[in-house]
Amino acid sequence: MINEIGQQWRGKKWYCYGTSMTDNSVRPGRNAGQLFDGQKSSPDRTGFYSQYLAEYAGLEEHNFGKGGKGIVPALHKEDSIKSRVMTLADGKAEADLITVEVIPNDAKAELGEITDWSDDTFCGNLNQILAYLLENTQAFVAVLIATRSRYNPGKRHHPAGEITQKRLRWEDAVEKICRMHGVPCWNGAAEANLGFFRVGLEQKYVYDQIHLTEEGGRVLAKYFWGKLQTVYPLR
């Protein structure tokens, strides 16, 4: 049961951008990930955290998440998260809250340096996205990290494994860029208690070693809701 101590976001317009972790209309493909032993099928959608965060906070949700997409245009053609964010055609000028969920689906890109503004690197595109939102809207802007991308029982995904260590380097870069721009980074992958030893070995919170189950989405939403209660709309 969510304790509704924070009412400041009730009725406010939330524009959310991101991957399949955010997109609550996605029907995962058969090759989205590997089911755990005993699982016969995948849920018909993902992005559960966005549904529950909107419910907990009383937000008017405008969901522009897109499964399989990232912020680096070279990897995602014309319809990238960046192209969805860097336009006012969707009405975001009236948004009270804008969140951009990042990292999944950009792993093949070059990370780059945190001071980079290039179209070719992850850091460069994140810098451009944040500058655009701060210059063109009066919304409260936050960057979200929802997952470490794959919760696999193999040793590469162990907390000390090479995959996790790579993700940590990317998360560190995101957090530093957010500090540079004066916006928060809410890192659910690091802080929502959905780590390897809780979710990597069974199916309660993650159903295909990638996407959160509905229960996992609720846990992540509660984490983000806790963060949201500590800040207020700018207008």
Q: What kind of region is each of these model predictions?
A:
Residues 13, 60, 139-141:
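Residues at the starts of beta-strands that form the adenosine-phosphate
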Residues 21, 67-70, 148, 192:
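Residue-level detector of flexible, active-site-proximal loop/helix-junction positions
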Residues 82-235:
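Alpha-helical cap/lid subdomain in secreted, periplasmic
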Residues 15, 24-120, 124:
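Conserved SGNH/GDSL esterase-like catalytic core that processes O-acyl groups on lipids
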Residues 2-3, 36, 41-42, 73-75, ...:
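Mixed-charge, polar/low-complexity N-terminal
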Residues 1-45, 55, 91-96, 135, ...:
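N-terminal secretory targeting modules
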Residues 1-2, 61, 128:
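Polar low-complexity intrinsically disordered regions
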Residues 20, 70-71, 204, 209:
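Residue-level preference for alpha-helix termini and adjacent loops
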